[in-house]
Structure formats: C-alpha cells, structure tokens
Amino acid sequence: ACLARRHRLPAEAVCVTNGATEAIYLTAQTFRGTNTAIVQPTFSEYADACRMHGHRVTSLYRLPAESEGYRLPEEVRMLWLCNPNNPTGTVVEKEYLATLISHNPQVCFVIDQSYEFFTLRPLFSAAEAAEFPNVLLLHSMTKRYAVPGLRLGYVTGAPHLLHRLRTNRMPWSVNQLAIEAGLHLLEHDVPDPLDVAS
C-alpha cells in the first residue's frame, strides 16, 4: 500500500518481490513458453529465467525505427529491456518507448528500471507505464538504497498483468524484516529522487 501511494497507483498495480531477481523469474514463469526477444547486450538473468521456463528466446541488437513502422518481429510476444541498461548504461528515450509500445499491442514489454535513479534522462513513471495494458516495470529498492542484502524489489503495471504475477508468486517470498526496512526507507526518502542530484 505504501508503494502504491508513492506511485499514485491502486494496490492491485503493485507486486512486491524478493529483489528484482525474483521479479525477473516470476515474470518468466508467469508467461512461460512465450516467444521472447531480449534487447542485447544486457543482464544475463533475463535469458536464464526465460529459458528455465520454456521461452523461445531470440536476441535483438537494435530496436525498430520509424522507417520500419516501429514494428517488432511478428513472432515476438514478450520483449525484455533493461533501461538504463546493465552493463552499457544506455537509455532508451521514454517518448520512443511509448511509440514502440503503442505500435506493438500484441507484445508484453518487460522494462527493468532497476537503475532508474542512476540517470537524469526521462524514464517512465510507474503511473505512466500502468496506463499501457502491456507493460511491466521492474524496480529495485536494493539498488536505489544500496542495501543488497535486503532483497526487496517490486513490479508495477496494469492490474490484470499484476494479478497473473501474484497467482504464481510463492507465499512469504518477502520476509517481514525486509518489509519493515523497506517501509522505513520509503518513509524517510527524499520526495523527488532528482533532488539528490541538484
């Protein structure tokens, strides 16, 4: 509920996970067997998780341009993008992503924004992304607050997608200590993360 309020989302649009890694594997499990494209080079866990759950994985080394109608390959039903990317640090602009998503309604976009507080470039807010019916945003409190042992992440998106994730999540995947620490961090956070850089 605290995360939902912070992002101005209904509680049904947020799913707390045991770090961003659980979010990755939970998403791959929920959409098992999908034709999946991963924007490369990137974090290897996306491919590992997808292969574990029977996805047919292909690599994309560039995203489609306006001259190509912003269309992804016809067989793709899920696209993984790390934004900002690990390990290159590149950022795909929000306006381009919105156009890409709108032109590919048949594709579920999994956008890992674990490093969202390491850039000043405009990215999707959770509320903006949740307006799309085919977008999941992955977030990492572990990285944001530099608490790697805490293992606390979350996914935001359209409620119907989050409902599917929750039906596959193991019970008690996030321990109470992590929850209490996460609440404390949220309650004592700088309201606007860009204030840190100013």
Language-model segment annotations:
Residues 5, 25, 29, 48-52, ...:
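Short, well-ordered alpha-helices that flank and scaffold nucleotide-derived cofactor binding pockets
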Residues 2-35, 53:
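Phosphate-binding glycine-rich loop
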Residues 67-75, 87-144:
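Active-site pre-lysine segment of PLP-dependent enzymes
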Residues 13, 29-82, 87:
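PLP-dependent aminotransferase-like
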Residues 134-198:
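PLP-dependent aminotransferase class I/II
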